[in-house]
Each structure stands twice: as C-alpha cells, then as structure tokens.
Amino acid sequence: KAADRIYGEGLGVSWSITEKSCIDAINELCYHIEAGIRVNRQTGLYEIVLFRDNWFEENEIHTISESKIKSMQYEITNADEVINQVNVNFYDRANIKNSSFSISESGLIQTLGRVNAETLDFPYFMNMRNAEIVANWKLKLLSTGV
C-alpha cells in the first residue's frame, strides 16, 4: 500500500546506499517520504507506514479505548517556539548543483512577529517538486503545537 501511494504521488527518491546499516537506510528513506517503520508481529518484517492526512479510509480507522492506554505524555509547545518557516536543501539534477528554497507559514510569522526557521535537508530528492511536497508536510507538523 505504501509503495503504491508513493508511486501515485510521484515521490521518486534517488540514492546509493554504501556502508549503512539496513535500519539507517530505512530511516533515511522514511525521512524523505514522511513515513515511519513498525515491525509486523505476525511476520517479524518491517513495514513502512506513511504519515498522510488521508492515509486510512474511514472504515479502516480503529479506536483505542482509554482503558488500554497505559501512559501518555503531551508536550505543550510554547507559541514562541513554533516553527513558521523551513529552509530546504536538495540536489537539483537539472542544473547539476545543490539548491535551496524556503517555505513559510505567513499567518504564524505575522502572529509571532518574527521568523522561526528550521533547515531540512533532502539530498535524495533530485527536483524541487518532491522536496517541496515533503517540506510542506513537515512544515504543517512543525507549525502545529500540541
């Protein structure tokens, strides 16, 4: 399901793995495609889970009863610490050079009265389109306090 979704989104990743552990390579891939990994208890195999707003159909969403939750911690984000801009670095294959651009949350910049930026590196994206898609997802997460 994850591979089909990534293909449909056109999120091509180009990279050569050398001298990395398998888990390190998987974690780097997950960073680029906004995903996580879990181990399937029945098979013992790793599974990639994409973090998307509409990843599950409504009938696939499971509810967890509060009695099943042993502990939960919320970390309240201070409004002054919310990220409202990301500076993105990627490799531009068409121009054969490293490139960068910025994406910002204008409303938050106005609210805070300043830019609070974080840098995202996507060395395995070879075009701005893919880096921009994932950077927007990451900015959405970073700019939303819990």
Language-model features: where?
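C-terminal extracytoplasmic interaction modules
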Residues: K1-V146
